[in-house]
UniProtKB/Swiss-Prot annotation:
It comes from Rhodopseudomonas palustris (strain ATCC BAA-98 / CGA009). One of its GO terms (molecular function) is protein-folding chaperone binding. PANTHER family: GRPE PROTEIN (PTHR21237), GRPE PROTEIN HOMOLOG, MITOCHONDRIAL (PTHR21237:SF23). The gene is grpE. Keywords: Chaperone, Cytoplasm, Stress response. GO terms for cellular component: cytoplasm. One of its GO terms (biological process) is protein folding. Participates actively in the response to hyperosmotic and heat shock by preventing the aggregation of stress-denatured proteins, in association with DnaK and GrpE. It is the nucleotide exchange factor for DnaK and may function as a thermosensor. Unfolded proteins bind initially to DnaJ; upon interaction with the DnaJ-bound protein, DnaK hydrolyzes its bound ATP, resulting in the formation of a stable complex. GrpE releases ADP from DnaK; ATP binding to DnaK triggers the release of the substrate protein, thus completing the reaction cycle. Pfam families: GrpE. InterPro entries: GrpE (IPR000740), GrpE_coiled_coil (IPR013805), GrpE_head (IPR009012). HAMAP family: GrpE. This is Protein GrpE. Residues 1-40 are annotated as: Disordered. The lineage of its organism: Bacteria, Pseudomonadati, Pseudomonadota, Alphaproteobacteria, Hyphomicrobiales. Homodimer. The keyword Cytoplasm applies.
């Protein structure tokens, strides 16, 4: 190949290159390392905040549960003991009920002092129970409430509304807002329907 031929080839290559269209590649922005780091920090902060809120909620629930358990232990911790003591209160009441009213009125000084001593003992016992949240209630004259009373029998009595407690065989007791022992009662049968009751009866030391 002569020099002239080589020059021709170079000229042809140059012309062909000029005729070919130029294809440019799209420009891709490089990732900003600082921006990615900021996003990661935001996610970590959100996760940490979420964990902190959950932990605070769990701690608050634990605090409330602990307070309730402590309060229940304080209120109901004497339940078993109080239930055993109720037998003593019942026996004192039976002893007083066994003495008729006329016998009390005409009792000799010795017997009268004995009766007064039993009454004083019963009052002291009920006061001690009440200081520990245990209260006696007598629902006589109120509408029967199965949440506080246990019906032992029915008494035909059209003079009072049906469902009225007309006799109390055994007084009931509550401890806190729970029934320690329901009252054993006799309920009237017949008469008009009794009005709604608001609970188990008046609470307190009822002699």
């Amino acid at each position: 190949m002569t020099e002239t031929d080589g020059q021709k080839d170079n000229n042809q290559d140059t012309a062909q290159a000029a005729a070919d269209p130029v294809v440019s590649k799209p420009y891709i922005m490089p990732d900003d390392p600082e921006e990615g780091s900021n996003e990661a920090l935001v996610r970590e902060a959100a996760d940490a905040r979420d964990k902190m809120l959950r932990t605070l909620a769990e701690m608050e629930n634990l605090r409330k549960r602990t307070q309730k358990e402590v309060a229940d232990a304080r209120t109901y911790g004497v339940t078993s003991f109080a239930r055993d003591v109720l037998d003593i209160a019942d026996n004192l009441q039976r002893a007083l009920d066994a003495v008729p009213a006329d016998a009390r009125a005409n009792a000799e000084p010795g017997l009268k002092a004995l009766i007064e001593g039993v009454e004083l003992t019963e009052r002291s016992l009920l006061n001690a129970l009440e200081k520990n949240g245990v209260k006696k209630f007598d629902p006589k004259g109120q509408k029967f409430d199965p949440n506080f009373q246990q019906a032992m029998y029915e008494v035909p009595d059209p003079s009072v509304p049906a469902g009225t407690v007309v006799q109390v065989v055994q007084a009931g007791f509550t401890i806190g807002d729970r029934v320690l022992r329901p009252a054993l009662v006799g309920v009237a049968k017949g008469g008009a329907k009794a009005a709604p009751s608001d609970g188990g009866g008046e609470t307190g030391n009822l002699n």
